[in-house]
Regions:
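Residues embedded in well-ordered beta-strands within globular domains across many folds
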Residues: 81, 121-123
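Short loop/turn motifs at secondary-structure junctions and domain boundaries
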Residues: 30-31, 118-121
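AMP-binding/adenylate-forming catalytic core of the ANL superfamily
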Residues: 10, 16, 36-116, 129, ...
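Conserved ATP/PPi-binding loop(s) of AMP-dependent carboxylate-activating enzymes
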Residues: 1-29, 59-61
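A short, polar/charged loop-to-alpha-helix boundary motif
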Residues: 60, 145-150
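Flexible lysine-rich "adenylation lid" loop at the C-terminal edge of ANL adenylation domains
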Residues: 125-147
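Structural signal for glycine-centered tight turns and loop->strand junctions in beta-sheet-rich domains
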Residues: 2-4, 31, 45, 88
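Short, small/polar residue-rich loop motifs at catalytic or cofactor-binding pockets
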Residues: 33-35, 123-124
Length: 150
């Protein structure tokens, strides 16, 4: 299917965001609500979540899928996050699994046939900023990279 914003028509949706009604109303289109997610419907009717709209990177179909593949195939990693660098290019941020060492040969072999990624930045798992629900704060990481001109 065609990629696009995921919108819902539901009696069970929220009516506002706490203390952020204007931001909520910006995402309401009549009876429809824009979830902030991005994806597509398969011909069989399955909804595929690809990314948050704010996290989209040009030439990457799905950051989430790419991160999942890298985590699944490279057992020395405990986290993979792909954010935009200051020029909008895909910048992997990776954390190593406990007691693991970076296997550069395996990394470069794995990403050779993927969309062009910059050399990953290694971070400790606990240093990757997260929300209270453990979601990685990609926009915060991008802002920090911009401050450091990385």
């Amino acid at each position: 299917g065609e990629n696009g914003h995921i919108q819902f028509l539901s009696k069970g949706r929220a009516v506002t965001y706490s203390k952020e009604d204007a931001r909520f109303q910006d995402n309401v289109y009549g009876a429809w609500w824009d979830s902030g997610d991005y994806g597509c419907m398969t011909p069989e009717g399955t909804l595929l979540l690809k990314d948050r709209q704010v996290d989209l990177i040009e030439h990457i179909d799905s950051n989430l899928a790419l991160e999942d593949v890298l985590l699944e195939k490279l057992d020395f990693l405990s986290e993979v996050v792909i954010i935009r660098d200051v020029n909008g290019a895909p910048q992997p941020i990776i954390a190593l699994a406990d007691d693991a060492e970076m296997n550069w040969e395996a990394w470069w072999a794995m990403v050779a046939d993927l969309p062009l990624l910059k050399e990953p930045i290694l971070m400790a798992y606990d240093d990757i900023p997260r929300t209270a629900t453990m979601k990685v704060q990609c926009l915060k990481m991008e802002a920090e990279m911009k401050e450091k001109n990385l």
